[in-house]
C-alpha cells in the first residue's frame, strides 16, 4: 500500500494567455483625442501586481499486489488534485471602474479525481517458451470547476461552476417539428426562420421563448473520462501471437460543419449519400405523398436551400457518443534459430505479420470515432498491414 501527498506550483502561465507581462501597466498613444496638436496617452493594459503561481494539492493512494506465485499482478491508484489560483482574466469588474482593459488574477479553482490501474496474469504452459499472458488497463479521470471568473449569469446552469471543464453545451432538441400545428403550439424560437421538418428545442427556463438563455450543459466533453485497453500474448516455442484492444468512453462531440451539409461546395465531403435515403430525413407529405415521411424523429431535418440558422445551433440533436473499442494491433511472429542461419553469421531471424487499426466498434458509422469531432477535416486513421523481417547478428 502506498500513499503520497504534496503541494506544487505551476511555473508558467496557461497556453492560451495572450498577455506576456500581465503585471505591467502599459501606456500607449491613442488617436481618438489630442492635446496641443499631439496624440493623447492612455493605459493600454492595467497591470496586476499581486499575481502568484497557480497551486495544487495532490494526493494519491495506491495498491500493488502479486498473487499465485507472482502470476497475477495488480496496481491500482486513486488520486485527487485540487487546484487554486488558476490564472484568469477578470470578468466581473464593473464598467464604472473605467478600466481600458480587464486585469488578470489568480481566481480559478478546480477539483480533479479518479483512478488508474492495470492487471496482468501469466499462465505457464510447460517450458519457459510456452506461456499465455493477459493484460488490462483502466483509467478514469473526472473534474469539477469550483470557482470560475465569469460575468453574472441569469441562471445557475449557465455558470461553469459545478460542471466538468469543457462540458459540451447546447440546446435540448425535442426532435423535429411535425407540421405547422406543431410550430403554432410550441414556444417561439429566436434563431431565424423555421418550418415543419426543422429542429424543435426545449424552452428550459419556461419563458415562452427559446433563445441563448436555454443553452445548458449537455453531456461530457471532447476529452474522454474513461480510457481502457486489454491485450493478450500467446507464445509456443518459436510461434508468438499478440493482440491489443483500446477504447474510450464517456466522451461526446458535436456533428457539424460542411460534413453534414448535403450539396455543400466544400472539399471536406458531406453526407449526401446518407441524406439520399428517404428514411433518414423529414420529407413533406406534399412531396412524398405519404404522411409517414413527416417523421419528427428522423435522423436529419428537412432539406433546405442555403443555410439554416435554426438547425445549425449546437444542440443535443447533433451531439454524438464518441465511445469506441478498437482492435489496435495484431502481430503474428515466427522465430528461426538453426545452424543454417549461423553459416551466414545470424543468431536468429524473426518473420512477422502485423496489422494496425484492423477494426473498430462504435455508434459512429460515418467517420472514425477518434476523429469524428473534426467532422471530416483531418487525414483519416489508416488500416496498415506490415510484413516484417528482423535479423539478429
Where are these regions (language model features)?
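Conserved small-residue
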Residues: 105-108, 122-222, 260-263, 269-295
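Extracellular/periplasmic, surface-exposed regions of secreted and cell-surface proteins
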Residues: 1-168, 310, 314-393
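Extracytoplasmic gating/loop element in the C-terminal half of outer-membrane beta-barrel translocons
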Residues: 248-349
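A short local loop/turn or secondary-structure capping micro-motif enriched for an aromatic residue
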Residues: 83-84, 220-222, 250-252, 369-371
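Short, surface-exposed charged micro-motifs
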Residues: 64, 191, 231
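Glycine-rich, charged/polar anion/phosphate-binding loops
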Residues: 45-47, 214-218, 225-230
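Glycine-rich, aromatic-lined ligand/substrate-binding cores of catalytic
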Residues: 221-256
Amino acid at each position: 500500500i502506498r500513499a503520497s501527498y504534496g503541494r506544487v506550483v505551476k511555473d508558467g502561465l496557461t497556453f492560451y494567455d495572450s498577455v506576456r507581462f500581465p503585471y505591467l501597466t502599459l501606456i500607449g498613444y491613442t488617436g481618438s483625442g489630442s492635446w496641443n496638436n499631439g496624440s493623447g496617452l492612455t493605459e493600454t493594459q492595467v497591470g496586476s501586481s499581486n499575481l502568484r503561481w497557480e497551486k495544487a494539492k495532490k494526493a494519491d493512494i495506491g495498491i500493488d499486489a502479486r498473487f499465485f506465485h507472482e502470476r497475477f499482478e495488480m496496481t491500482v491508484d486513486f488520486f485527487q488534485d485540487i487546484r487554486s489560483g488558476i490564472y484568469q482574466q477578470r470578468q466581473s469588474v464593473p464598467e464604472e471602474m473605467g478600466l481600458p482593459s480587464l486585469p488578470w488574477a489568480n481566481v480559478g479553482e478546480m477539483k480533479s479525481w479518479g483512478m488508474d490501474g492495470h492487471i496482468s496474469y501469466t499462465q505457464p504452459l510447460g517450458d519457459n517458451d510456452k506461456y499465455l499472458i493477459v493484460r488490462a488497463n483502466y483509467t478514469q479521470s473526472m473534474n469539477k470547476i469550483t470557482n470560475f471568473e465569469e460575468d453574472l449569469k441569469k441562471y445557475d446552469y449557465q455558470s461553469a461552476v459545478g460542471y466538468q471543464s469543457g462540458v459540451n453545451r447546447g440546446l435540448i432538441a425535442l426532435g423535429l417539428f411535425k407540421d405547422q400545428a406543431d410550430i403554432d403550439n410550441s414556444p417561439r424560437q429566436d434563431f431565424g426562420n423555421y418550418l415543419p421538418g426543422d429542429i424543435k428545442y426545449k424552452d428550459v427556463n419556461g419563458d415562452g421563448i427559446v433563445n441563448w438563455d436555454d443553452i445548458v450543459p449537455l453531456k461530457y466533453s471532447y476529452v474522454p473520462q474513461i480510457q481502457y485497453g486489454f491485450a493478450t500474448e500467446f507464445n509456443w516455442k518459436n510461434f508468438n501471437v499478440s493482440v491489443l484492444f483500446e477504447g474510450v468512453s464517456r466522451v461526446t462531440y458535436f456533428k457539424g460543419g460542411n460534413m453534414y451539409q448535403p450539396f455543400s461546395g466544400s472539399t471536406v465531403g458531406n453526407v449526401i449519400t446518407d441524406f439520399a435515403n428517404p428514411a433518414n430525413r423529414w420529407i413533406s407529405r406534399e412531396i412524398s405523398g405519404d404522411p409517414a415521411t413527416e417523421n419528427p424523429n428522423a435522423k436529419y431535418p428537412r432539406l433546405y436551400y442555403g443555410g439554416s440558422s435554426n438547425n445549425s445551433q449546437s444542440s443535443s440533436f447533433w451531439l454524438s457518443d464518441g465511445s469506441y473499442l478498437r482492435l489496435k494491433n495484431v502481430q503474428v511472429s515466427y522465430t528461426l534459430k538453426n545452424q543454417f542461419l549461423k553459416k551466414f553469421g545470424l543468431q536468429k531471424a524473426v518473420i512477422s505479420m502485423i496489422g494496425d487499426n484492423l477494426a473498430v466498434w462504435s455508434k459512429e458509422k460515418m467517420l472514425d470515432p477518434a476523429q469524428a469531432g473534426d467532422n471530416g477535416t483531418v487525414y483519416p486513421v489508416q488500416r496498415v498491414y506490415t510484413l516484417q523481417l528482423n535479423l539478429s547478428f
